[in-house]
């Protein structure tokens, strides 16, 4: 960093002489621009509504018929089984992760609903839900809840790098992105 060069006594006196008789200008024309909200910012009320809307699909009474042999897996009727195979092989990598460790069943349902809403809002196709081993309550309930949701296309037990049998990789049906129409 350069040192400031100091003025000689002669230069300082010349500066003071030239500046005598001047007055300070008052700045009174400051314009403050209003702070704009980010366009991508979603209101909290809308987030809570999306979470509630997506979590009402999860019922504890309804027991969908899932394969109990081998790895936990599910594919919706209108989805190709090849998608499930690609999910199992690790062709899809999850972009969002949800950890359900330590949550109650009600909290877990709400978080699953919020995750599905976030995936659809952010156009995320694959996500990972970590239910853990624990007392096997969430491990048993999570696949049953996911199979009930209409936007869940498929899920499969996660590979080791994403949690193994303590996690699920989930494919979410997302809406096609449409660019906004210009006026």
Swiss-Prot record:
Residues 98-173 form the Smr domain. InterPro entries: Smr_dom (IPR002625), Smr_dom_sf (IPR036063), SmrB-like (IPR022990). Coiled coil: none annotated. The keyword DNA repair does not apply. This is Ribosome rescue factor SmrB. Gene3D superfamilies: 3.30.1370.110. Belongs to the SmrB family. Keywords: Endonuclease, Hydrolase, Nuclease, RNA-binding, rRNA-binding. GO terms for molecular function: RNA endonuclease activity; rRNA binding. The lineage of its organism: Bacteria, Pseudomonadati, Pseudomonadota, Gammaproteobacteria, Enterobacterales. It comes from the Bacteria.
């Amino acid at each position: 960093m350069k040192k400031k060069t100091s003025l000689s006594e002669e230069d300082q006196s010349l500066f003071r002489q030239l500046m005598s008789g001047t007055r300070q200008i008052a700045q009174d024309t400051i314009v403050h621009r209003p702070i704009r909200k980010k366009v991508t910012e979603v209101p909290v009320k809308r987030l809570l509504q999306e979470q509630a809307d997506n979590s009402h699909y999860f019922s504890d009474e309804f027991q969908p018929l899932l394969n109990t042999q081998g790895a936990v897996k599910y594919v919706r009727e209108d989805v190709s089984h090849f998608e499930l195979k690609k999910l199992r092989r690790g062709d899809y990598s999850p972009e969002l992760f949800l950890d359900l460790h330590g949550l109650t069943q009600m909290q877990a349902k709400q978080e699953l609903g919020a995750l599905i809403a976030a995936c659809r809002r952010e156009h995320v196709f694959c996500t990972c839900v970590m239910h853990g081993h624990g007392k096997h309550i969430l491990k048993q309930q999570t696949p049953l809840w996911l199979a009930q949701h209409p936007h869940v296309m498929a899920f499969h037990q996660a590979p080791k790098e994403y949690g193994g049998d303590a996690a699920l990789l989930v494919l979410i049906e997302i809406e096609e992105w449409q660019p906004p129409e210009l006026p």
